Amino acid sequence: MPKQIHEIKDFLLTARRKDAKSVKIKKNKDNVKFKVRCSRYLYTLVITDKEKADKLKQSLPPGLAVKELK
């Protein structure tokens, strides 16, 4: 079941949870979507700024499996 997160802070807190399994990064021409899989929901954060997306990618937790999609 999907849920959308609108704040970067909330997304980082969700990514640090112990039930967070993996992060998928989908890049389109106008935005970047970060999808974090937790036990119950798939949380999505949509960012339109490419620089913010790069910074967020750097600040993801190191133990999380990160997969980049086209």
From Swiss-Prot:
Presence of keyword Repeat: no
Recorded name of the encoding gene: RPL38
The organism of origin for this protein: Branchiostoma belcheri (Amphioxus)
Give me the Gene Ontology terms describing cellular component: cytosolic large ribosomal subunit
Q: Look up the domain of life of the source.
A: Eukaryota
**Record GO terms (molecular function):** structural constituent of ribosome
Query: PANTHER family of this UniProt entry?
Result: 60S RIBOSOMAL PROTEIN L38 (PTHR10965), LARGE RIBOSOMAL SUBUNIT PROTEIN EL38 (PTHR10965:SF0)
Please indicate if the UniProt record lists Ribosomal protein as a keyword.
yes
- By its UniProt entry, which InterPro entries does this protein fall under? Ribosomal_eL38, Ribosomal_eL38_sf
Record keywords, A-Z: Ribonucleoprotein, Ribosomal protein
UniProt-recorded name of the protein: Large ribosomal subunit protein eL38
Q: Which GO terms describe its biological process?
A: protein-RNA complex assembly; translation
Transmembrane annotation, as ranges:
none
Q: Which family does it belong to?
A: Belongs to the eukaryotic ribosomal protein eL38 family.
